[in-house]
């Protein structure tokens, strides 16, 4: 049989090891080195570090690498406090000193604002809370592994559908973290674990809340065990057989207190993850907005009334507008519960022109907006038409804040205050607040 020559396969670029110097961090917290003048992004590295990296992706304008060996650590490097760090997709900056994280996030905010809006301003002091045990809500992923016949119970890995099994989480508040091992043990013995979707955990002011999302029927005896667990921990238990269905099995309806106001909510409603930072954020928003007894204030993306209720105690009137009708109804109920009669709430698509809406026919003295990560591009150009002299923009994405600020500046507003809100310590995620004035 003839034998043909076959050259050895060349080593693919993706598998080569390279020694590089990390020069800075990108806006997602990844280290940036340069390889042949091309930026190389390496998760888990810090500026000033010499590392060995394995290329995992190589494009024409950038490359990505995996940290193989740390040759020279940065002074800001610390030992991660969670054994699941690097696997769990939650925290991505536990290897960095906390004060260094704050400085990095503030630099990121300033850089983005300057890049997109051209604005340069001194930052206000950052709003911070607890470094650990700060999360009052979390979603635990569940998946039944048919091969191993084990229930996967934990958090999604970074950029993956795989589950990192956990029974502890140091950034969860203690009353939620202590539930993890017991919930895993109970759910692992359900008769139909393939019907389990996820568990939503929330720490309300009147106790923990456990919500089980399931996609098929559950046996009464299984639900009884879960109910017993909830009652032992003085927690409220909900079942969620569909995304729009909630059934309270035991316990009280949850609520939280916000600077003197009681805010009831359901476990599938959005509330801020970090209670201490949220409280300070509301106080700062009130200080910057400075509502007077003669002011008509507009609260866009008002949710349950996190800002509307406190503003109403100081302003002549508050108009809250939200894109989710269920939240609008709950905000109105929350105002009534707190005996607030100068607030009204409306449902509207805040991605479209709203100036013609009846609630927008009145002029407003001041505006607060707190959009989702996508920002407020659909409505930001309409702000000046409402007549407000002062606008407070609360943002969970500095890139969209910077983008939207361009429009506000073009409408004649000036950026007079800017500050970072550290809602998620030990992650690269940052929130911010900006004040615009005419």
Swiss-Prot record:
Record EC number: 2.1.1.190
An example Gene Ontology biological process: rRNA base methylation
Keyword terms: 4Fe-4S, Iron, Iron-sulfur, Metal-binding, Methyltransferase, rRNA processing, S-adenosyl-L-methionine, Transferase
Active site: 396 (nucleophile)
Function: Catalyzes the formation of 5-methyl-uridine at position 1939 (m5U1939) in 23S rRNA.
Protein family: Belongs to the class I-like SAM-binding methyltransferase superfamily. RNA M5U methyltransferase family. RlmD subfamily.
Protein name (database record): 23S rRNA (uracil(1939)-C(5))-methyltransferase RlmD
């Amino acid at each position: 049989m003839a034998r043909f020559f076959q050259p050895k396969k060349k080593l693919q670029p993706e598998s080569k090891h390279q020694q590089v110097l990390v020069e800075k961090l990108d806006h997602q917290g990844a280290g940036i080195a340069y390889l042949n003048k091309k930026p190389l992004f390496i998760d888990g590295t810090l500026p000033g570090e010499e590392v060995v990296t394995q290329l995992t992706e190589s494009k024409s304008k950038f490359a990505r690498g995996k940290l193989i060996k740390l040759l020279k650590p940065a002074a800001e490097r610390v030992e991660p406090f969670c054994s699941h760090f690097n696997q769990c997709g939650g925290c991505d900056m536990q290897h960095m000193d906390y004060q260094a994280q704050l400085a990095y996030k503030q630099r990121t905010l300033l850089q983005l604002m300057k890049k997109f809006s051209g604005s340069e301003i001194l930052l206000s002091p950052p709003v911070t809370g607890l470094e650990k045990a700060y999360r009052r809500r979390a979603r635990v992923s569940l998946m039944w592994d048919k091969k191993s016949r084990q229930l996967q119970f934990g958090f999604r890995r970074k950029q993956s559908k795989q589950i990192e099994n956990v029974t502890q989480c140091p950034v969860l508040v203690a009353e939620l973290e202590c539930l993890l091992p017991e919930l895993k043990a109970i759910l692992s013995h359900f008769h139909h674990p393939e019907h389990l979707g996820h568990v939503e955990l929330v720490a309300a002011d009147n106790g923990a809340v456990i919500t089980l999302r399931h996609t098929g029927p559950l046996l009464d005896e299984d639900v009884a065990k879960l109910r017993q667990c909830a009652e032992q921990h003085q927690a409220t238990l909900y079942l969620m057989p569909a995304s729009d269905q909630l059934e309270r099995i035991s316990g009280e309806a949850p609520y939280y207190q916000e600077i003197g106001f009681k805010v009831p909510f359901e476990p599938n409603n959005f509330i801020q993850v970090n209670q201490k930072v949220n409280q300070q954020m509301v106080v700062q928003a009130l200080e910057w907005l400075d509502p007077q007894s003669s002011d008509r204030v507009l609260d866009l993306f008002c949710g349950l009334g996190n800002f509307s209720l406190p503003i109403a105690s100081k302003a002549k009137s508050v108009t809250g507008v939200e894109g989710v009708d269920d939240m609008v109804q709950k905000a109105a109920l929350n105002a009534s519960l707190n005996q607030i009669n100068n607030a009204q709430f409306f449902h509207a698509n805040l991605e479209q022109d709203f100036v013609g809406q009846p609630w927008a026919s009145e002029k407003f003295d001041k505006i607060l907006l707190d959009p989702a990560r996508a920002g407020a591009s659909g409505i930001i150009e309409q702000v000046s038409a409402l007549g407000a002299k002062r606008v407070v923009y609360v943002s969970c994405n500095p890139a969209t804040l910077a983008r939207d600020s361009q429009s506000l500046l073009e409408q004649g507003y000036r950026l007079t205050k800017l500050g970072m809100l550290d809602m998620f310590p030990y992650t690269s995620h940052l929130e911010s607040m900006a004040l615009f004035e005419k």
